[in-house]
Protein backbone atom coordinates (compact mmCIF):
# COMPACT_ATOMS: atom_id res chain seq x y z
CA UNK A 1 0.00 0.00 0.00
CA UNK A 2 1.36 3.39 -1.03
CA UNK A 3 2.08 5.91 1.69
CA UNK A 4 0.31 9.24 1.61
CA UNK A 5 2.60 12.06 0.52
CA UNK A 6 0.18 14.98 0.91
CA UNK A 7 -2.19 16.29 3.53
CA UNK A 8 -5.92 15.46 3.54
CA UNK A 9 -6.85 18.82 1.96
CA UNK A 10 -4.76 18.14 -1.13
CA UNK A 11 -6.02 14.54 -1.32
CA UNK A 12 -9.58 15.84 -1.17
CA UNK A 13 -8.82 18.29 -4.00
CA UNK A 14 -7.43 15.43 -6.10
CA UNK A 15 -10.42 13.19 -5.36
CA UNK A 16 -12.88 15.92 -6.33
CA UNK A 17 -10.99 16.79 -9.52
CA UNK A 18 -11.00 13.08 -10.46
CA UNK A 19 -14.83 13.23 -10.52
CA UNK A 20 -14.79 15.81 -13.33
CA UNK A 21 -15.61 14.14 -16.68
CA UNK A 22 -12.43 13.65 -18.70
CA UNK A 23 -10.15 13.66 -15.66
CA UNK A 24 -8.95 10.38 -14.22
CA UNK A 25 -6.85 9.97 -11.07
CA UNK A 26 -3.57 10.76 -12.85
CA UNK A 27 -4.89 13.81 -14.66
CA UNK A 28 -6.50 14.99 -11.42
CA UNK A 29 -3.14 14.75 -9.62
CA UNK A 30 -1.45 16.75 -12.39
CA UNK A 31 -4.21 19.36 -12.37
CA UNK A 32 -4.09 19.66 -8.57
CA UNK A 33 -0.32 20.03 -8.59
CA UNK A 34 -0.54 22.70 -11.30
CA UNK A 35 -3.21 24.60 -9.35
CA UNK A 36 -1.13 24.45 -6.18
CA UNK A 37 2.02 25.65 -7.95
CA UNK A 38 0.03 28.59 -9.35
CA UNK A 39 -1.81 29.22 -6.10
CA UNK A 40 -2.24 32.99 -6.49
CA UNK A 41 -2.82 33.00 -10.27
CA UNK A 42 -5.11 29.93 -10.49
CA UNK A 43 -6.14 28.22 -7.26
CA UNK A 44 -7.37 31.36 -5.48
CA UNK A 45 -9.30 32.80 -8.45
CA UNK A 46 -10.71 29.35 -9.30
CA UNK A 47 -11.87 28.87 -5.73
CA UNK A 48 -13.57 32.29 -5.78
CA UNK A 49 -15.17 31.64 -9.19
CA UNK A 50 -16.50 28.27 -8.02
CA UNK A 51 -17.93 29.85 -4.88
CA UNK A 52 -19.68 32.52 -6.93
CA UNK A 53 -20.99 29.91 -9.38
CA UNK A 54 -22.32 27.83 -6.49
CA UNK A 55 -24.14 30.86 -5.07
CA UNK A 56 -25.47 32.33 -8.32
CA UNK A 57 -26.02 29.60 -10.95
CA UNK A 58 -29.66 28.86 -11.72
CA UNK A 59 -31.55 26.63 -14.13
CA UNK A 60 -33.68 28.71 -16.50
CA UNK A 61 -37.35 28.05 -15.74
CA UNK A 62 -38.22 28.60 -19.41
CA UNK A 63 -35.65 26.58 -21.39
CA UNK A 64 -33.51 24.63 -18.90
CA UNK A 65 -30.23 26.42 -19.69
CA UNK A 66 -27.80 27.24 -16.88
CA UNK A 67 -27.12 30.91 -16.17
CA UNK A 68 -26.93 33.37 -13.31
CA UNK A 69 -30.30 34.92 -14.22
CA UNK A 70 -33.77 33.43 -14.73
CA UNK A 71 -35.02 33.60 -17.43
CA UNK A 72 -31.59 33.07 -18.94
CA UNK A 73 -29.62 35.33 -21.28
CA UNK A 74 -30.65 33.26 -24.33
CA UNK A 75 -34.37 33.50 -23.52
CA UNK A 76 -34.24 37.28 -22.99
CA UNK A 77 -32.05 38.04 -26.02
CA UNK A 78 -34.19 40.22 -28.30
CA UNK A 79 -31.74 39.73 -31.19
CA UNK A 80 -32.59 36.01 -31.38
CA UNK A 81 -35.35 34.54 -33.50
CA UNK A 82 -37.54 33.32 -30.63
CA UNK A 83 -39.96 31.71 -33.12
CA UNK A 84 -37.42 28.91 -33.72
CA UNK A 85 -36.57 26.54 -30.87
CA UNK A 86 -33.63 24.15 -31.05
CA UNK A 87 -34.24 21.17 -28.76
CA UNK A 88 -31.08 19.68 -27.23
CA UNK A 89 -30.35 16.91 -24.74
CA UNK A 90 -28.00 18.84 -22.48
CA UNK A 91 -26.57 22.32 -21.87
CA UNK A 92 -23.25 21.17 -23.37
CA UNK A 93 -25.09 20.59 -26.68
CA UNK A 94 -26.50 24.13 -26.52
CA UNK A 95 -23.00 25.50 -25.99
CA UNK A 96 -21.64 23.41 -28.90
CA UNK A 97 -24.32 24.73 -31.27
CA UNK A 98 -23.67 28.29 -30.11
CA UNK A 99 -19.93 27.85 -30.84
CA UNK A 100 -20.86 26.74 -34.36
CA UNK A 101 -22.74 30.04 -34.77
CA UNK A 102 -24.97 28.67 -37.52
CA UNK A 103 -28.33 29.80 -36.08
CA UNK A 104 -29.52 32.61 -33.89
CA UNK A 105 -32.50 30.82 -32.36
CA UNK A 106 -33.93 29.98 -28.95
CA UNK A 107 -33.21 26.66 -27.22
CA UNK A 108 -34.89 24.08 -25.04
CA UNK A 109 -32.80 21.71 -22.90
CA UNK A 110 -34.45 18.34 -22.24
CA UNK A 111 -32.00 17.20 -19.58
CA UNK A 112 -31.39 13.84 -21.25
CA UNK A 113 -33.23 11.36 -23.46
CA UNK A 114 -35.94 8.78 -22.96
CA UNK A 115 -34.45 5.51 -21.80
CA UNK A 116 -36.92 2.95 -20.45
CA UNK A 117 -34.07 0.56 -19.58
CA UNK A 118 -32.60 3.23 -17.29
CA UNK A 119 -36.01 4.18 -15.92
CA UNK A 120 -36.06 7.58 -17.66
CA UNK A 121 -39.53 8.45 -18.92
CA UNK A 122 -41.17 11.62 -20.28
CA UNK A 123 -41.87 12.98 -16.78
CA UNK A 124 -38.14 12.82 -15.96
CA UNK A 125 -37.27 15.19 -18.82
CA UNK A 126 -38.18 18.80 -19.64
CA UNK A 127 -40.68 17.73 -22.33
CA UNK A 128 -43.80 19.17 -20.66
CA UNK A 129 -42.11 22.59 -20.57
CA UNK A 130 -41.44 22.34 -24.32
CA UNK A 131 -45.05 21.43 -25.08
CA UNK A 132 -46.23 24.34 -22.91
CA UNK A 133 -43.91 26.77 -24.73
CA UNK A 134 -45.26 25.72 -28.10
CA UNK A 135 -48.82 25.88 -26.78
CA UNK A 136 -48.28 29.56 -25.90
CA UNK A 137 -48.00 30.27 -29.64
CA UNK A 138 -45.48 32.21 -31.70
CA UNK A 139 -43.27 29.18 -32.45
CA UNK A 140 -43.02 28.40 -36.16
CA UNK A 141 -40.23 25.79 -36.17
CA UNK A 142 -38.85 23.21 -33.79
CA UNK A 143 -35.41 21.81 -34.63
CA UNK A 144 -34.78 18.54 -32.81
CA UNK A 145 -31.01 18.39 -32.27
CA UNK A 146 -30.58 15.26 -30.17
CA UNK A 147 -27.85 12.65 -30.57
CA UNK A 148 -28.26 9.98 -33.25
CA UNK A 149 -28.61 7.19 -30.68
CA UNK A 150 -31.52 4.82 -30.11
CA UNK A 151 -32.52 6.93 -27.10
CA UNK A 152 -32.20 10.14 -29.13
CA UNK A 153 -34.36 8.73 -31.95
CA UNK A 154 -36.95 7.52 -29.42
CA UNK A 155 -37.05 10.96 -27.79
CA UNK A 156 -37.41 12.71 -31.16
CA UNK A 157 -40.32 10.44 -32.15
CA UNK A 158 -42.02 10.95 -28.79
CA UNK A 159 -41.77 14.75 -29.05
CA UNK A 160 -43.07 14.66 -32.64
CA UNK A 161 -46.05 12.52 -31.57
CA UNK A 162 -46.85 14.86 -28.67
CA UNK A 163 -46.91 17.88 -30.99
CA UNK A 164 -49.26 16.40 -33.59
CA UNK A 165 -52.01 18.85 -34.45
CA UNK A 166 -50.07 21.93 -33.36
CA UNK A 167 -49.19 24.34 -36.14
CA UNK A 168 -45.40 24.03 -35.89
CA UNK A 169 -42.86 22.78 -38.41
CA UNK A 170 -40.67 20.03 -36.91
CA UNK A 171 -37.23 19.32 -38.38
CA UNK A 172 -34.21 17.25 -37.35
CA UNK A 173 -30.52 17.83 -37.76
CA UNK A 174 -29.12 16.11 -40.83
CA UNK A 175 -26.91 13.11 -40.10
CA UNK A 176 -24.12 11.91 -42.29
CA UNK A 177 -20.68 12.70 -43.62
CA UNK A 178 -18.80 15.25 -41.47
CA UNK A 179 -16.98 18.14 -43.13
CA UNK A 180 -13.55 16.84 -44.12
CA UNK A 181 -14.62 13.24 -43.50
CA UNK A 182 -13.45 10.40 -45.74
CA UNK A 183 -16.04 7.79 -46.69
CA UNK A 184 -13.65 4.90 -46.11
CA UNK A 185 -13.39 5.79 -42.40
CA UNK A 186 -17.14 6.16 -41.71
CA UNK A 187 -19.28 3.43 -40.18
CA UNK A 188 -22.16 1.88 -42.10
CA UNK A 189 -24.85 3.63 -40.03
CA UNK A 190 -23.38 7.06 -40.77
CA UNK A 191 -23.09 6.29 -44.49
CA UNK A 192 -26.69 5.02 -44.60
CA UNK A 193 -27.92 8.18 -42.84
CA UNK A 194 -25.93 10.34 -45.27
CA UNK A 195 -27.50 8.60 -48.26
CA UNK A 196 -31.01 9.03 -46.85
CA UNK A 197 -30.37 12.74 -46.12
CA UNK A 198 -28.85 13.50 -49.53
CA UNK A 199 -29.63 16.89 -51.09
CA UNK A 200 -29.84 18.28 -54.63
CA UNK A 201 -26.83 20.38 -55.76
Swiss-Prot record:
Keywords: DNA damage, DNA recombination, DNA repair, Metal-binding, Zinc, Zinc-finger. Residues 83-178 form the Toprim domain. It comes from the Bacteria. Pfam families: RecR_C, RecR_HhH, RecR_ZnF, Toprim_4. PROSITE patterns: RECR, TOPRIM. GO terms for molecular function: DNA binding; zinc ion binding. One of its GO terms (biological process) is DNA repair. A zinc finger (C4-type) spans 60-75. Belongs to the RecR family. PANTHER family: RECOMBINATION PROTEIN RECR (PTHR30446:SF0). HAMAP family: RecR (MF_00017). This is Recombination protein RecR. It comes from Rhizobium leguminosarum bv. trifolii (strain WSM2304).
